[in-house]
Amino acid sequence: MKNPKFNEKFNKIFNLELYQNNPSDYVHSHVDQIISLLLYAWAIANKPQSPKDTQIVALLLFISSESKGLLEQIRTGEGKTLILGLTAAFFALCGYAVDVVSSNRDLAIDGEQKCRTFFELLKLESGHICSENDDINHQSYRPDLSTKQGNIVYGEVGAFQRDILEDEFNNKKIFGIRYKDREKCLIIDEVDNMCLDRARHVLYLSHEIASLKWLETLFINLWAAVLRTEVNNSNEISQNIEDISYFMKKNIENKNIYVSEYLYDYVDYKLKRWIDSAFQGRIMREDDHFVLDIPKADGQNIQKHRTIIVVDKDTGTEQYSTRWSNGLAQFLELKYRRKLSVESLKAVFISNKTFFQRYKTHLYGLTGTLGSENSQSFLADLYNVQFADLPTSRKKSYYRFPSKASFEHEDWLDSIARESIQQVKIRPVLIICENVESTENIWNELIRHGVPPHTIAKYRRDGNNIEERFRKKSCYKR
């Protein structure tokens, strides 16, 4: 986007020798001038939207937090995308390599695209690492070395972790010299979910060993044994695991189940874990813990065959690069008659905690809920951060209806449908479901009550571009 007046103002600042010699010192010593420039740029790039007072305060708090990181609580609807964009731009102008982590791939792509024009006005390079093409993703890490400004990369936490492992352990030189002579800074969306709820989550780079293919016969026999077992309560499962383990070992010793001798120790070590996974797979349901469908990227199918796609129960997003370990993936493939994959071995790994701690005092985050005092104390000790609770930009005008409870599933669905039909006469209705299964059940119940299908926008999977649909037609006339 070209804006002669803005470009003149921008060039007057950033062509200065003081900025070229030390961008960070110059920006921090001229904060009022830089913030004025950022707000002006955002207003040009996003007419008629301008930052609100609370959003400016959020930016100022991030800037003033020098010796520690900062996690801010800001309510839903207060414009986190704008705050993330302003903060990323400020630290990129300081010369930092800025990484922005979202809770899923779709939000990362959307966040970068919404801020791209704003970044371009400030002559900042931005990109995301959410493409199916690794070469395109890796290009996002390569800044223009002729400028002192840093560049900005959006992505989900797993994508950054994978690239770190590939770069540092497999020597793929993904980052080039991006982090070599620059400070690095991490800005996190939904920080409580990733830093607290998922602090123990670990990303592995796995390796498939061809010889483990010979375990297929064992997996089939394990699955058959688990299906034959009667389980009346969860307390019985431990004893069932012991019994099946003993039975399988005897069959392996007697050559009734073939296992190569060089795999004996490995099988002995993993057998009980596999049996436990088989019991888990037996009770796991499609459209709850996972979906059975064709993976999508940017709304396009990336495979021809339906496969098991892990669903994150916290966010409802599909985890295309995630596979369950300890045989669980294989037992679900047997359950749903998919092609049986080979059990993989974990080679190198990194936890969420370790990843976030790499950024030291340059760790910044936003969330709708910071949690209890105990949670905040835990985060402060773990990541060396402090906290801020920001007020809303205006007084909220809403009230809560009395809660209703149903004892039967059919009554629960009926109540939701009747209440929705009543409320939609005067306002739009949003129904947030626990899983895909509930989405389908409520959809069918609304249809049963006579709601026309074309008046219901159903968001069932990643890649369903519901936001674009509502931009074109925000509500339905009744």
Where does each model-flagged region fall?
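Conserved P-loop NTPase motor core
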Residues: 1-478
